[in-house]
Amino acid sequence: EPKSPLTLFVSQVDNSAYPQVTLYTKIADQAGSTPSSLDASQFTVTETDSSGSQYPATVEQVVPLAVGDAMNINLVVDQSGSMRARSKMDSAKKAASSFVDEMVKTQGNVAEITSFNDYVYNRQPFTSSAALLNSAIDAVSPTGETALYDALYWALQRTNLKSGSRVVIAFADGEENSSNCSLNDVITLSQQTGIPIYIVGVGGDVNRSSLQSLASSCNGAYYDAASDDLAQALRQIYQSIYDDQRSMCRVVFTSTCPGSTSATRTVLLSCSDSGPFAGQISHTYVPVTSISSYDTSVSSQDYVLPDSASKYYSRSELEKMSLWELYLARNEIFARHGRGFKNQDLTDYFATKRWYTQTYTPEEFDAISSSQLNDYELKNVQTMYEIEQSRNSPYLETAK
């Protein structure tokens, strides 16, 4: 009996539980649909290490992504000066807000907001809170140059901290002109981490061939967004990318390869000889990736508010910031004096700042804080806290 051909495409690799490995794989029949009769016995996996030695592994699970399977999405937003033209920034914000509102309705989904101009800004770490995500999107304003590669590199590093289905979706309206990281740096890191990059380009200044090549090399795709109705075009593209990722199957196996876990391997996923289907796909990955969450080669600012110890900030100035940035700026004042933190996002963030040294536990510092802070700092902390209260910041419910 002739076998039914299948088209296989490995979009991403989750190696967070290595030696157990999960391949997020598009499995489609000739009609473009995922067959309903898939099971693990119909597939085989063979790993090839850097020396060419081959090691078979048993496929333990082949299942479509269920509604409850978590997705981790890093949404990268261009805030360079060219985004001022034709209300592109407003349209991009509307589309991004609409997307995250829908995305977080699925239990387990989380997103992070990254924006960029000359610098890269972590506007909001991964969360399922629509309020925090929309606050981050609202805080983005256009100015400066276009450090797209830095932003993508940063987003890959941050997304690599998550387990499960992971994807970076970037929006850009101009050509890269300000990054420390190179195109090859981004492609290499995407391939190392197994995280795909999808890119949406808008306007005539976009280098389409370069971005298409980048997205393709990163197992993603490139989209053109019509600028005449940008908000609607972006909403449709974001939904298409989301649907594409949700159409994947999880192919799970446990590696038997004894080689170096830091060297690139090739995994061959094939339909088994005894099964009803025919098809195969190879994919390279690195079993264990030691990737920092915040890399110093990326241009990011040392302080949220560098002069909060010498300037009184008005409410109108501070209200332009996202809830995460307010929370960060308030705790940045404490961090300058050596306070430690219980919140893991704060701990991760300040650990990358060369100026930061923890001197006190949170409890020790809170007992003496009134004598440590000057008048500017005390007033700024009070104003930030009042704004956070008025905006019902979820961060007020978390450990500092």
What are these regions (language model features)?
Residues 1-4:
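Proline/serine/threonine-rich low-complexity linkers at boundaries of modular beta-sandwich domains
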Residues 10, 15-74, 79-88:
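Acidic, polar low-complexity linker/tail segments
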Residues 14-19, 216, 223-294:
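C-terminal "exit" segments of structured domains
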Residues 26, 73-81, 116, 303-315, ...:
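Acidic/histidine-rich, surface-exposed loop or edge segments in extracytoplasmic proteins
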Residues 71, 77, 88-93, 97, ...:
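Exposed acidic/Ser/Thr-rich ligand/metal-binding surfaces
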Residues 204-213:
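Short, glycine/polar-rich helix-capping loops at beta-to-alpha or helix-loop-helix junctions
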Residues 317-358:
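Amphipathic alpha-helical packing elements
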Residues 341, 348-400:
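Compact alpha-helical subdomains of small soluble proteins
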